Amino acid sequence: MPSFDPRDLADLVRRPIVTEKATILMEQNKYTFEVIPKASKPEIKAAIEDLFQVKVVKVNTNLPPRKKRRVGKFIGYKPQYKRAIVTVAPGDEDKIRQVLFPEV
């Protein structure tokens, strides 16, 4: 297993993605995050395990196509992002939910 600098791991994960599909996946211990596009699966796994103190079973990544945006006659693109769906070991879902969704 390659070693990663823990100071750099926190910068890999940008934010959790909370959509209808992501909420349905949470019932299966799968959590969705937006990560930087150059992050690899082992780096994402190490970052999630370090940030949330959970055991990651599997990491799936998705790089959706960039969307076109038009401003007047100029055509541009939205910034590209990478989506990571992280499967957490059974029993660890309470740890990650307390951090992502604290009780008010």
From Swiss-Prot:
The GO terms describing molecular function are:
rRNA binding; structural constituent of ribosome
Task: Kindly give the Pfam families that the UniProt entry links to this protein.
Answer: Ribosomal_L23 (PF00276)
> Is RNA-binding found in the keyword set?
yes
Report the superkingdom from the record: Bacteria
Q: Which GO terms describe its biological process?
A: translation
Q: Which InterPro entries match?
A: Nucleotide-bd_a/b_plait_sf (IPR012677), Ribosomal_uL23-like (IPR013025), Ribosomal_uL23/eL15/eS24_sf (IPR012678)
* Entry keyword set: Ribonucleoprotein, Ribosomal protein, RNA-binding, rRNA-binding
The record's Gene Ontology cellular component field reads: ribonucleoprotein complex; ribosome
Matches recorded under HAMAP family? Ribosomal_uL23_B
Functional summary from the UniProt entry:
One of the early assembly proteins it binds 23S rRNA. One of the proteins that surrounds the polypeptide exit tunnel on the outside of the ribosome. Forms the main docking site for trigger factor binding to the ribosome.
Family membership noted in the UniProt record: Belongs to the universal ribosomal protein uL23 family.
Q: How does it assemble?
A: Part of the 50S ribosomal subunit. Contacts protein L29, and trigger factor when it is bound to the ribosome.
Q: What's the protein name?
A: Large ribosomal subunit protein uL23
Taxonomic source organism: Nostoc punctiforme (strain ATCC 29133 / PCC 73102)
Upper classification of the source organism reads: Bacteria, Bacillati, Cyanobacteriota, Cyanophyceae, Nostocales
